[in-house]
Amino acid sequence: MPRATLPPEARLHRPSEFAAALKGRRLARGAFFILSAAPSSPPPGQAAQARLGMVIAKRYAAHASTRNALKRVIREAFRHCRLELPPQDYVLRLHSKPAPATLTSLKRLARAEVDAHFARVRP
């Protein structure tokens, strides 16, 4: 079984990559996140694979600890299912302000929603 790592090649880095993925199809929308995807455009010499980008705006998650916790949850969920996803560029965007809750309960809710979004995409 291959290792479920998240190398730099599995992440979006350039603003143009984010823009292309955000203009692509919207695959899922939940209480917190919108999942968009576009065909993967890997750098020359690399095979097409699922890549992840995240947009967690300060407008919706004012505290840095909240933003960082959400990003950690998203990365971990993607890391576990990355090899099963079709080779596309995925962007998860926070679209609403989470209700006041403890960080633990927020992470639990976010993980459930992100897992559900990626489950819809798997073949």
Curated annotation (Swiss-Prot):
InterPro entries: Ribosomal_Su5_D2-typ_SF, Ribsml_uS5_D2-typ_fold_subgr, RNase_P, RNase_P_CS. One of its GO terms (molecular function) is 3'-tRNA processing endoribonuclease activity. It catalyses: Endonucleolytic cleavage of RNA, removing 5'-extranucleotides from tRNA precursor. Keywords: Endonuclease, Hydrolase, Nuclease, RNA-binding, tRNA processing. One of its GO terms (biological process) is tRNA 5'-leader removal. It is an enzyme of class 3 (hydrolase). GO terms for cellular component: ribonuclease P complex. Its EC number is 3.1.26.5. RNaseP catalyzes the removal of the 5'-leader sequence from pre-tRNA to produce the mature 5'-terminus. It can also cleave other RNA substrates such as 4.5S RNA. The protein component plays an auxiliary but essential role in vivo by binding to the 5'-leader sequence and broadening the substrate specificity of the ribozyme. PANTHER family: RIBONUCLEASE P PROTEIN COMPONENT. Belongs to the RnpA family. Consists of a catalytic RNA component (M1 or rnpB) and a protein subunit. This is Ribonuclease P protein component. It comes from Bordetella petrii (strain ATCC BAA-461 / DSM 12804 / CCUG 43448).
